[in-house]
Amino acid sequence: MRVLFCSSEIYPYAKTGGLADFSFCLIKYLKKYGVKVKGVMPYYKTLKAENLRKTDKGVTLNLNGKDYTFEVYESEDCYFLRNDELFGRDYIYGPPGWGYEDNDIRFGGFSRAVSELISTGQLEADVVHANDWQTALIPLFLKEVFKTPVKTVFTIHNLAYQGLFPKETVERVGIPPYLFHMEAVEFWGLVNFMKGGIVFSDLITTVSPTYAKEIQTQEYGYGLEGVLKKYSYKLRGILNGIDYEVWNPEKDKYIYQNYSLRNYSKKFKNKEFLSKELGIEAEKPLISFINRFTHQKGVELILNCAEEMSKLNANFVFLGTGEYENAFLDVSKIYKNFKVFAEFNEGFARKLYASSDFILMPSYFEPCGLTQMIGMRYGCVPIVRKTGGLRDTVKDISEGGYGITFEEPSKETFLCSLKRAIELYENAKKFRNSVKIVMSLDFSCDRMTKEYIECYEEVQSHQ
């Protein structure tokens, strides 16, 4: 089976978020299971790659009345489509806070170029796997423009970002005009790239079973709940995984003291070192938030509860960047048990995972979430809101589980969950048992990869 994995970002070549990690992980593990897989992504100015080989493959497209030539480079595991006018820029999607105005041409053009390269046999595939709005038009182009027999799988990582563009985009990127209607890519007078992937792919996946259900509701569907209900027969929820070779406290070179499930008590040495470094009391529970400071991650809930949290017998560490980072920095100046680091620092993040007693994720919505999985891999007991993948990965201790969960995103329920966590910590035997359980859970890429292989086999069996 030959799989072409299409993504706007693949680690280590380009990364702005979890899509890059997912792409890297799935490609790596598909190879492990004998699948002939290769990634394909844009050749960005910021691309982190060496020794790429320029191939004799390529395609020229007319986009918005102008010709663009895409040259094809390759590494061992990935193709890169190069057009410096479109992708030779300082940012992948645009400066912080906004996207480039021609992102429809950039990613619509990329999707059409990939599709034409497949249709002409320059890129080989039995199954094409597209991801999120940036590559969502590939199933449409393959089926409606190039009429290829290649099967397609489309993964929704976050429905909140759909790739919405004006009606003129139809002509600008070469979408057949007859597809601009509500049963295809039209969405309230706009072109919706994500909708194109949903309608024209052979199978849709999303990143957790609960999120697959949630996106069919008005609360989480962002206007696409109707079309997702219509195509629910081809929708699957597959829980994301993390690479246990990359995230491994037994071999992590960044942390103070390596440890594993067999000698997990060494984890607490990490906490002692970090507490000394940060000037906090090691005997108090350490609750950490390692994520973006954005609305989705429930940060308003934290900020609204800051005064009450300052009175709890616990220390809180926040690591991340985003629109609320100044608000967090301001709070940290008021309350001594709040430590805030407004940066993306992988080395420090790993130290924090290894040192923390609890990992905090009060997200308003969470398609899957990797932070809680990494935290549990490192022995952090999760405190999460029951939504999306958080619901699928964390079982409350009151129900025979190992974590702390809450349902309503209110001050009362959130503070109650923090108090329950502190009570758990103060019961040393019960707390250490939870640590042992979370470290023994399997959220590896192995499980996820097997499910995707089943999806590929399913679409190949379709006539």
From Swiss-Prot:
SUPFAM superfamilies: UDP-Glycosyltransferase/glycogen phosphorylase (SSF53756). GO terms for biological process: glycogen biosynthetic process. The keyword Transferase applies. ADP-alpha-D-glucose binds at K15. Pathway: Glycan biosynthesis; glycogen biosynthesis. Its EC number is 2.4.1.21. Keywords: Glycogen biosynthesis, Glycosyltransferase, Transferase. GO terms for molecular function: alpha-1,4-glucan glucosyltransferase (ADP-glucose donor) activity; alpha-1,4-glucan glucosyltransferase (UDP-glucose donor) activity. It holds the Pfam family Glycos_transf_1. InterPro entries: Glyco_trans_1, GS/SS, Starch_synth_cat_dom. It catalyses: [(1->4)-alpha-D-glucosyl](n) + ADP-alpha-D-glucose = [(1->4)-alpha-D-glucosyl](n+1) + ADP + H(+). Belongs to the glycosyltransferase 1 family. Bacterial/plant glycogen synthase subfamily. PANTHER family: ALPHA AMYLASE DOMAIN-CONTAINING PROTEIN, GRANULE-BOUND STARCH SYNTHASE 1, CHLOROPLASTIC/AMYLOPLASTIC. Synthesizes alpha-1,4-glucan chains using ADP-glucose. This is Glycogen synthase. The lineage of its organism: Bacteria, Pseudomonadati, Aquificota, Aquificia, Aquificales.
